[in-house]
Amino acid sequence: MRPLTPRQTEILELIKRNIADTGMPPTRAEIATRLGFKSANAAEEHLKALAKKGCIEIMPGTSRGIRLTQEDAEVELGLPLIGQVAAGEPILAQEHVEQYFQVDPHMFKPAANFLLRVRGDSMKNIGILEGDLLAVHKMQEAKNGQVVVARVEDDVTVKRFEKKGNVIYLHAENEDYAPIKVDLTCQSLTIEGLAVGVIRNGAWL
């Protein structure tokens, strides 16, 4: 199989994840929406390229006519490493991906969707250290006590989640840092994912 471009890898990963989560492949329109394409036609062109490389089969006449090939089952896509996140952009936007690591997503429970490089020492008391790669399961809701990747206004942070009414507290695991208080009546907060594991700094570089 010929090597895939980063964009093709991203689309193939999206297809696999959608099948794993819902039991069916995404439509062209869903691919376009999730990856920021202007139209479903752009997604179709990438799907044709993946078909030529033997990763998928395209079945005409149905919006979900995408099937993974047996050959592709042997390909390890790896996980995208997210770097700096631009304000207002989806965390998994292609421009945020620094590189891909050959890590099995299913070694984490639940399975990881991406890696985030840890900056700072605010979570050091639970072993999340500067420079570590945090494995993250993409989700939009969290329970009290979970360690999450959250976007507060335009800043992305890793903290322990606590919700009390309309107020959310993001707690550090380091006595030097005060909790971040977010009043949902006047501030915005988005849960980007749940921390599911750590790859120690340098272990995979």
UniProtKB/Swiss-Prot annotation:
Active site: 122 (for autocatalytic cleavage activity), 159 (for autocatalytic cleavage activity)
EC number of the protein: 3.4.21.88
Keywords on record: Autocatalytic cleavage, DNA damage, DNA repair, DNA replication, DNA-binding, Hydrolase, Repressor, SOS response, Transcription, Transcription regulation
Site entry: Cleavage: 87-88
Reactions the enzyme catalyzes: Hydrolysis of Ala-|-Gly bond in repressor LexA
Highest taxon of the lineage: Bacteria
Hydrolase recorded as keyword: yes
Gene Ontology terms, MF aspect: DNA binding; serine-type endopeptidase activity
Family: Belongs to the peptidase S24 family.
Assembly notes: Homodimer.
HAMAP family found in the cross-reference section: LexA (MF_00015)
Identification of the protein by name: LexA repressor
Organism phylogeny: Bacteria, Pseudomonadati, Pseudomonadota, Gammaproteobacteria, Alteromonadales
